[in-house]
Regions:
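Glycine/tyrosine- and acidic-biased, solvent-exposed loop/turn segments at the edges of beta-strands
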Residues: 1-175
Length: 175
């Protein structure tokens, strides 16, 4: 650790660590921040740069199972304003360890195909996005694997449901 950094550690009443935060010489969060549940199990790890979330963030359930993982990226505009957005893949899991959802972000906007799953592992939704809005055919499956609905979106606006016997593979999708 740099001699110009300070570490602040907070504890729960039972003596377990609650959080560990590093600060730079300007008093802003810098590096890895870790939070724990009162039980002592790790709750979250997030990286900071000059007080702003930057890089990998991981959350866990109190049981120790991974809950969520994403990345943050910091941007600065021409006026010097700083923004932090999700950037890259975001994944969530059920406490059982089964994947719950997965999507991708580009400068804070969801893009491409977002998927959600039932805890059984069966896909629940496939949702196409283009620059943060729904665009293309959104498909919903039942837990048994049967397609329940197909809705067409264009630039974020619903254009209606497709007939259930229609093959969505032939419908135009997000590119």
């Amino acid at each position: 650790m740099d001699k110009n950094e300070d570490v602040e550690i907070e504890y729960w009443c039972n003596g377990n660590k609650r959080s560990e935060v590093r600060y730079n010489c300007n008093g802003k969060e810098e590096g890895l921040r870790t939070d724990w549940y009162e039980s002592g199990a790790k709750e979250r790890e997030a990286h900071y740069k000059n007080g702003i979330a930057e890089g990998l963030r991981t959350d866990w359930y109190e049981s120790g199972a991974k809950k969520m993982e994403c990345r943050n990226k910091t941007w600065e505009d021409r006026l010097g304003n700083t923004y932090t957005n999700l950037h890259g893949k975001k994944t969530e899991w059920y406490e059982s360890g089964a994947k719950k959802s997965e999507c991708k972000y580009s400068t804070g906007r969801i893009t491409g195909i977002a998927n959600t799953w039932y805890e059984s592992g069966q896909i629940e939704f496939e949702i196409p996005f283009k620059i943060g809005v729904r665009h293309g055919v959104e498909i919903k499956w039942s837990e048994s694997g049967k397609i329940e609905s197909e809705d067409f979106y264009e630039e974020g606006r619903s254009k209606g449901k497709l007939p259930l016997n229609y093959t969505s593979k032939n419908w135009p999708t997000h590119k």
